[in-house]
């Protein structure tokens, strides 16, 4: 498998969930992979699984300085960053009426500021070398509007859609392609914890939820990862500035 042969891929939020699946898929396609995360024991375990040449960088991506420094560490180790994936995210609940300034700021920091400054550093490296590069931002189908209890999350992720398109337009002449993926409801350990913590879900909730969906299942991290690898690779051609709904619901469709 060679879609990303010898490419240096940085996956922010790559130590677990969708990010970890993307890291595994990138390695399978021949990439040298670095992942960031806040929990060393999780990140180091994944890197051991990924094998020789993989790198874990401890970083709190809500801190702009750490987001930029993580890119710098990857450049120091590998000499460059060819591909960046922003997969870190915060999904804590809040409505328009009960969201505190602190919760709002936390969502903006993780879901928008972190990707902004990671892109700033990674794209600067790509441009300085005069080589093509790719960025994929993991966003959410909820950014189209979402549920009432996701107000700060939706605000931040909708901002990431705008940033994705703005940056893609700004750097298309540099041959840096920047795209986004609006993923739908996905079966991860984090989603299981969210359902239990915020919605009182019990054992068996996943099977019940899956049975009510058109495809009979929630989105799968490995499926998302394969799609991200395609977007990162030359196989996706010239596409840039696209924000793709990776979901089994159709925007505007009514039952």
Predicted regions and their residues:
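Short, small/polar-rich loop/turn modules that mediate ligand/substrate recognition or access, typified
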Residues: 85, 172, 177, 239-241
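Substrate-binding pocket helix/loop in short-chain dehydrogenase/reductase
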Residues: 95-96, 103-108, 209
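Alpha-helical segment proximal to the catalytic Tyr-Lys
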Residues: 124, 169-173, 237
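Conserved glycine-rich cofactor-binding loop
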Residues: 15-16, 39
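Active-site helix of classical SDR
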Residues: 119, 156, 164
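Short C-terminal tail/terminal secondary-structure segment
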Residues: 145, 229, 240-255
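Residue(s) in the substrate-gating loop at a strand-loop-helix junction
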Residues: 140
């Amino acid at each position: 498998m060679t879609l990303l042969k010898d490419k240096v891929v940085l996956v922010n939020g790559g130590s677990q969930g969708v990010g970890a699946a993307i890291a595994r898929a990138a390695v399978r396609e021949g990439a040298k992979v670095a992942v960031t995360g806040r929990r060393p024991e999780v990140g180091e375990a994944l890197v051991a699984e990924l094998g020789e040449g993989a790198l874990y960088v401890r970083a709190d991506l809500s801190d702009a300085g750490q987001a930029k420094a993580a890119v710098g560490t990857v450049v120091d180790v590998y000499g460059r960053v060819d591909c960046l994936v922003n997969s870190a995210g915060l999904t804590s609940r809040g409505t328009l009426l009960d969201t505190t300034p602190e919760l709002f700021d936390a969502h903006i920091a993780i879901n928008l500021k972190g990707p902004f400054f990671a892109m700033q550093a990674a794209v600067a490296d790509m441009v300085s070398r005069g080589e093509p590069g790719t960025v994929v931002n993991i966003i959410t189908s909820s950014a189209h509007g979402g549920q009432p209890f996701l107000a700060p999350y939706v605000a931040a992720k909708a901002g990431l859609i705008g940033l994705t398109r703005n940056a893609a337009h700004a750097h298309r002449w540099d041959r840096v392609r920047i795209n986004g993926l609006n993923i739908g409801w996905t079966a991860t350990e984090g989603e299981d914890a969210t359902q239990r913590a915020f919605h009182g879900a019990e054992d068996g909730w996943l099977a019940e939820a899956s049975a009510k969906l058109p495809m009979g299942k929630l989105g799968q991290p490995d499926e998302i990862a394969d799609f991200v690898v395609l977007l990162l690779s030359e196989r996706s051609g010239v596409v840039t500035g696209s924000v793709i709904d990776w979901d089994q619901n159709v925007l505007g469709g009514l039952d």
